[in-house]
Each structure stands twice: as structure tokens, then as C-alpha cells.
Amino acid sequence: VLSGKGGVGKSFVTGAIATELARHGHKVGVLDADITGPSIPKMFGMSGRHVHALGNLMLPEISEHGVKVMSSNLLLQNETDPVLWRGPVIAGAIRQFWSETSWGPIDYLLVDMPPGTGDVALTVFQSLPVDGIVIVTSPQDLVSMIVAKAVNMAEKMNVPILGIVENMSYIECPDCGKKIEVFGKSKLPEVAERYNLDILGTLPINPALAEACDKGEVETALPDGMLPKAVSAVEAITPHETDEA
């Protein structure tokens, strides 16, 4: 799950898809590749928790509803400690999160990418068997250029794009239910047509849900059936179970 820029809610979309897949009975893991700005553990109620070892392997933390998570924040003594690592160290950590973690049998492993198309993205595409990409955007003027970068990267790495999700598309008036496009009219249909992408969903600004994520309650607060097209696109991929290790 990636975006060309920060602040579009990519981690929330990752968490939402993971939660819905788990509700469908799938075994799900989330590899948090946003090493310097991880938010997945907090979203899943793992603040203050740390990974443990099983021999030479790390054990991912498991959420209340069974989602397995591996993140740099789970390795730190305090979750507010900065991760002052250079690029090669970050790349090595991501490879370890994949190859030296005892994921057990899982159906789907979602990778929450950092913003942009730099070293981390290259490491993930070269080191992990990536079956598909979900692009996350917001309704802003730069969306076309940002999507173009993601599309070009996917083509160069020969990875299929499952589709695009637009977050923060609108806010619903609490009194009349009218949709207010606070960031302007969405350009998603035009961009999707230009790059031949499937639209996997548009999400509103939801302050209550954002607050629940900050409290680590995404699994209980997420409405049923959120992002059904995105979940179906992931489920259409033939699952590859990891080894028991």
C-alpha cells in the first residue's frame, strides 16, 4: 500500500484493509515498512509492546483480532524514540522483517510503505514477492503527478496495480448528511481513466474514526464493509502461505 506523498492516510487504508480481511476469516499480517514514521502498532493497540524472539527469528505482535504486525516501533524501548538510521540500515531492517520474522501461515501480508518512491520502495519490490499495489491519494491538484510516479514505478518493477483509493474525499454534514468536498472536487475519475486504474473506493474525513485509530481501536471502530472493492481486489490474488517458520 503506497502513496507518492505523505499525509494522505496510507497507513489507515492499510489498517482498514487488514481489518476487513481478518473479518473475512483470512490470516493477515502487516509489515510496517515506514521505518522512520511507523503508525501501524498504535492503530492496532500495540503501544508499549515489544517483539520477542524465537531462536533466531522475531515473533510479530498479534492484535486483539489476530492481525500480526512487525514494525520498527516494536523494537524501540520507547515508541517516541526517533529512528536515526541511514538508508542501507533501513533497507536491511525491512529485509529482516520479511525473512527473519516468524510470520507463521498467513494468507495475506500487507506492506505499509513510507511516502514516495525511493530506497524503501526499491528494497520492498526487489526483496519481497509483491503480488499487487494499492495506491492511496487525496483530492488535491498534485494527485495526477503523484499517481504517475507510482504507476511508472510499478511498471518498471513489473508489479500489477490493483487500483487506487482516495482518502479524505469529503466530509459529511452531521445535520443534513450533505457531502462537502473540503479539498475541492475530486480528480479521481479523470486520473483513473488516464492511467487505466480501477477505483477501489473513496473515503470521507471521519474525526471519530481517526480518534479511534489514535486510541488503538481500529479493529472495533471500523465500520463493516469499508473499502469492499479494495478487499475484493486483494482477495482475488491467489494466497501464498508463508512457511511455518
Give short role names for the model-derived ranges.
Residues 6, 32, 40, 70, ...:
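Residue-level signature of catalytic and energy-coupling elements of molecular machines
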Residues 151-245:
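C-terminal lobe/tail of nucleotide-utilizing enzymes
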Residues 1-32, 151:
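Walker A/P-loop phosphate-binding motif and the immediately C-terminal alpha-helix
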